Amino acid sequence: MTPRTPRYAVSRAAVSVTSVLALLALGACSSDPNSIAEQAKKGDQKGYIAGNGAIEQIPVDQRLKPVTLEGTTLDGRQWSSTSERGKQVVVVNLWGSWCPPCIEEIPDLEKVWTDVQAAGKPVQFMGIDFREDPQRGAAFVKTQRMTYPSLTDESGVLILAFGRQAPTSPPSTLVLDREGRVAARANGAVSATTLQGLIDDVLKSES
């Protein structure tokens, strides 16, 4: 009698085939080596893209209402995402000095921030110092030489602005399109290559 294939094996195979087909479909839409689709084809950041759901890109016609994120930066300035609406893509990164993965991804975030500025791309970075005394957060920013601004969020309420799309814990990164809608999310530390790909894909989706 021929042994039966375990049901879980069939399910896993089906999921794998579905993931591959989805990535191939994405690849057909882009030839940009920085795009997430091209990264998937090459295998870069494969764990993020094909399997654990850490990266999500939202098509233009499926994006929800604009997010209004506002607060006080660690250097005492008032800021609102509405001031960027219609002009710039906003990259929001949730972090804390008490979070080891957050510390590890800082060089990658800094690299992308420096690169988009040098290239003159319409992109603004804004961190959220999550559940931390602002003085401690400000000292950490100085020590780590973080050049992009961050909002202070000692009470942990700013993420409520994202509604059901709110990140659950740091590190998390969200990319808002120029209309202020969440266009991409990365749950967990993100590499410079992946973040640049997400940003470029959002910029192209609105061109």
Task: State where each predicted segment sits.
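Short cysteine clusters
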Residues: C29, C99-C102
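Thiol/disulfide oxidoreductase modules built on the thioredoxin-like
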Residues: A139-T147, D153-E206
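Hydrophobic beta-strand anchors of alpha/beta hydrolase catalytic cores
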Residues: V91-V92, F125
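A short beta-strand-turn-helix
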Residues: D61-R63, T68-V90
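Structural microenvironment flanking redox-active thiols in thiol-disulfide oxidoreductases
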Residues: I103-Q144, E154-A161
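N-terminal targeting signals for export/organelle localization
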Residues: M1-E70, S207
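Aromatic-flanked redox-active Cys/Sec active sites in thiol-based oxidoreductases
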Residues: N93-C99
